[in-house]
Design a protein with these regions (language model features):
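Cysteine-centric segments in proteins
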Residues: 1-92
Length: 92
């Protein structure tokens, strides 16, 4: 049975959240402004990148790179023309 870990970042006026459910098959869900916009699965502790769009005009392509393990999962937010940012873990 896996455990759920939550991460968040605000970017360009939009809320980006990620949930990583660990286990033999890790599941990553990404929400933009509260709506699920992307998901992916990976096996064991292999990293996975989820590509999503921010609803800007024109839409902005961003991605969340999730690493389920080993240890505590982590998520990195990547957007054009900026350094990658570590997403803050959330306790809920």
């Amino acid at each position: 049975m896996g455990r759920r870990h939550h991460f968040h970042i605000d970017h360009d006026g939009h809320s980006v959240s990620a949930t990583v459910e660990t286990g033999r098959t890790a599941v990553v869900e990404v929400l933009v402004d509260g709506k699920e916009t992307g998901h992916a699965t990976t096996h064991d502790d292999h990293p996975v990148t989820v590509h999503v769009e921010l609803p800007t005009d024109p839409p902005t392509q961003v991605s969340v790179r999730a690493t389920p393990g080993p240890g505590v999962p982590r998520c990195i937010f990547e957007a054009p023309a900026m350094e990658p940012h570590i997403m803050s873990p959330r306790p809920y």
